[in-house]
Amino acid sequence: NMYASALASNKKYTFICLLPQHLEGEYWTAVELGIHEAIATYSDFNTSVKINYYDPYDYHSFVNASEAILALQPDGVMMAPTAPQYTKGFTDRLQASDIPYIYIDSNIKNVPPLAFFGQNSRQSGYFAARMMMLLAREEKEIVIFRKIHEGIVGSNQQENREIGFRQYMKEHHPSCTILELDLHAERNDEDNEMLDEFFRTYPMVKNGITFNSKAYIVGEYLQSRGKKDFNLIGYDLLERNVTCLK
């Protein structure tokens, strides 16, 4: 009986989670809550967890955080991976130390983990494009909104969603122009000004999508400007996102 054996064992297990830095109420808040609930539920197994963070817009931050984890030699690691080349440097050293690891949120197939918990991001983006065009119909222009810093969008998941989205558009709506608006990840106070400029330049664009969990940035802007004729698709049931649906 594995359960009885674990209860009888005096071994203590330490796991480390590596997550993107985030504000209270954002997507990763719920993930953290789930981690702590799991540890509480399985406290009989003498498990503990430590959560480390990295800046999702800075690859070197991920590298530094991974170095700190390796120095602690935990029994297992759960991570939200960054770009494959930086993730692989970390996972190679975990494997060399016989430390198992799992991915959450986004998967890297050529750097396979023990397990992955999340969606198929490309299929999600592909399906989102289909939904978008059910709304856009014969419209000739749509827009992708991003939060970006120095060319980095912040997660593999967002990149793969966009790849799937563009694949569908290329296959089924090749004549539709895909516009882009990159909002500064580090300068939120400029969002409304940049959105104002975009809609002055493209007043006829009525459909857009964001592949991150911050659809509320555009949604709240649309509400503040009284724009009720714009269709916006986003991800994740954050409270501020849900409020924009009401």
Regions found by a protein language model. Name each.
Residues 85-123, 238-246:
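Flexible loop/hinge segments that line or gate small-molecule binding clefts
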Residues 39-60, 143-144, 166-189:
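Short beta-strand elements in bilobed, periplasmic/extracellular small-molecule ligand-binding domains
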Residues 116-143, 191-192, 238-241:
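Hydrophobic alpha-helical segments within soluble ligand-binding/sensing domains
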Residues 129-172, 180:
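An alpha-beta-alpha
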Residues 69, 76-95, 165, 177-241:
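Hydrophobic alpha-helical
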Residues 4-32, 114-115, 141-153:
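Short beta-strand segments enriched in small/hydrophobic residues
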Residues 42, 97-98, 172, 225-228:
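Helix C-cap/helix->beta junction micro-motif
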Residues 28-36, 63, 122, 126, ...:
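Short, surface-exposed alpha-helical segments at coil->helix boundaries
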